[in-house]
């Protein structure tokens, strides 16, 4: 029997270290970043998992608050009985009641392209998880990481740059871009050290 994140501070800390390292590396990168998953909400309070494919834009709220993402994951695990890997990857988002979006889509672009959407993947969840079912810390985080004009169930593609004032993107190079979307890039942090080791 696996111990839940909510009952295992050591496992929570390992997940936090891993996610912090990945988000910082992505935000600091000027080439391909690590492939990461992050979670957001929509206007209906439903959740979606976004997979960066090493290139997709991420709201600064996510890169600046890895602990907030971990709090969401702890609540999702508690509600859905889903065990997150130490790296935080989420296979088959519908299993946790979330929609799935991937920056690569059917064809990986090979580089960051401003305005390129994340594409919906997989099956929609049979029973979408709602922000209202999460604890107050997770709900507050997801109110900030929200696409307030979109419904994930109605969306086939989502452009992160259209919904957030400030983003991180893992590259300084792009072509065929929408130049108006290049201005909200947050300052790059210092790159992290070595990747944290999993103690699982």
Predicted regions and their residues:
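Low-complexity intrinsically disordered segments
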Residues: 66-200
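Short N-terminal edge-element motif at the start of the domain
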Residues: 2-61, 66
């Amino acid at each position: 029997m696996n111990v839940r994140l909510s009952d295992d501070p050591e496992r929570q800390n390992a997940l936090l270290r891993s996610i912090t390292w990945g988000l910082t590396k992505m935000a600091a990168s000027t080439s391909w970043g690590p492939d990461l998953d992050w979670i957001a909400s929509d206007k209906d309070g439903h959740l979606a998992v976004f997979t960066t494919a090493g290139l997709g834009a991420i709201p600064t709220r996510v890169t600046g608050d890895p602990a907030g993402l971990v709090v969401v994951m702890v609540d999702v695990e508690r509600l859905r009985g889903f065990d997150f890997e130490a790296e935080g990857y989420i296979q088959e988002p519908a299993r946790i009641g979330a929609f799935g979006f991937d920056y690569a889509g059917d064809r990986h672009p090979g580089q960051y392209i401003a305005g390129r959407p994340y594409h919906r993947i997989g099956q929609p969840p049979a029973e979408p998880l709602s922000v209202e079912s999460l604890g107050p810390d997770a709900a507050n985080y997801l109110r900030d990481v929200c696409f307030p004009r979109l419904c994930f169930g109605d969306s086939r593609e989502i452009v992160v740059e259209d919904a957030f004032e400030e983003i991180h993107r893992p590259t300084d190079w792009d072509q065929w871009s929408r130049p108006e979307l290049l201005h909200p890039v947050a300052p790059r942090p210092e790159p992290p050290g070595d990747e944290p080791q999993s103690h699982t």
